[in-house]
């Protein structure tokens, strides 16, 4: 992927062009406060980026584990689902189970090594932790619903067994491997992974909640979509701090590319019609989500799409940490977001 060949590089061979692109990116990295190497990266205090630190504390406050999701009521619902509904849900879970591992690959291989600001490194470290929880949760859901070992194995190997999952995975993996692209381009690409590639699937599971189905699955979906909304907001915050941002044209190109892949995934490869949703409205919803992401990145809308799903009005991807502040199901770690003075222990109380 990366930028088209520059005219001034037309006479260079491929290795020379690659070296030229890499050197140019290194120069640009040195101009970025977020990426500039410093011994300060080993020490958290004093906080230099309070808004980045606040997002880290939000992530910390919303930590949860797979064991806290009750799946005991899901199996009776699962057994009553139509074959098409089971097919759709199991394949969506297979996509999710693989995707969180890819997000973590990027965080470990690229972002955590490139970013030098300790507040952001704290966030990425916690994101890696919660992405592991997400992956475990999706694997546990597959393990609970799918009793046939061969079907289970097929789903756990979705990147190899399902071409449409592989297509989405390959798109993300190419960005991890791309040494020519700038940090800003890759921030946008992974905001698209978490903000666009996940959005339609989240909406499909919320649709099941609207129908009163699968309480364990839908509760875990609330928690995970809240987390991913925060991760997407964090990517947009990091983007705002960049000195050398990609052009609006380049950002649009990346996000529109992701939109096309996601629309194909949920309206052709794994159509939401299988669970009774409208494919045309799903296409519109994905465009709406993409427009919202573009606005949060500081650019104008491409699609001018309205939200066609009323039941998606209040979830995390709707806007800046809305869902977090709503505290889904009152689920937030006690005192993590409280002011320090709220939790001071004193010995002068009357007993």
Curated annotation (Swiss-Prot):
Give the cofactor binding note. Binds 2 iron ions per subunit.
Q: Which cofactor does it need?
A: Fe cation
Q: Which GO terms describe its cellular component?
A: cytosol; mitochondrion; nucleoplasm
The residues that the entry says bind Fe cation 2 are 131, 194, 228, 231
The record's annotation in SUPFAM superfamilies points to:
Ferritin-like
Catalytic residues per the record? 138
Predominant place of localization: cytoplasm
Q: Region entry Disordered: which residue ranges?
A: 1-31
Q: Which Gene3D superfamilies match?
A: Ribonucleotide Reductase, subunit A (1.10.620.20)
Reaction(s) catalysed by this chain, per the record, are: a 2'-deoxyribonucleoside 5'-diphosphate + [thioredoxin]-disulfide + H2O = a ribonucleoside 5'-diphosphate + [thioredoxin]-dithiol
Report residues binding Fe cation 1: 100, 131, 134
Q: What is its EC number?
A: 1.17.4.1
Q: Which domain of life is it from?
A: Eukaryota
- Any idea where this protein resides? Cytoplasm; Nucleus
Keywords, A to Z? Cytoplasm, Deoxyribonucleotide synthesis, DNA damage, DNA repair, Iron, Metal-binding, Nucleus, Oxidoreductase
- Mention one GO molecular function: identical protein binding
GO terms under biological process: 2'-deoxyribonucleotide biosynthetic process; deoxyribonucleoside triphosphate metabolic process; DNA repair; kidney development; mitochondrial DNA replication; negative regulation of intrinsic apoptotic signaling pathway by p53 class mediator; positive regulation of G0 to G1 transition; positive regulation of G2/M transition of mitotic cell cycle
Q: What does the similarity note say?
A: Belongs to the ribonucleoside diphosphate reductase small chain family.
Q: How does it assemble?
A: Heterotetramer with large (RRM1) subunit. Interacts with p53/TP53. Interacts with RRM1 in response to DNA damage.
Q: What does this protein do?
A: Plays a pivotal role in cell survival by repairing damaged DNA in a p53/TP53-dependent manner. Supplies deoxyribonucleotides for DNA repair in cells arrested at G1 or G2. Contains an iron-tyrosyl free radical center required for catalysis. Forms an active ribonucleotide reductase (RNR) complex with RRM1 which is expressed both in resting and proliferating cells in response to DNA damage.
Q: What is this protein called?
A: Ribonucleoside-diphosphate reductase subunit M2 B
Which species does this protein come from? Pongo abelii (Sumatran orangutan)
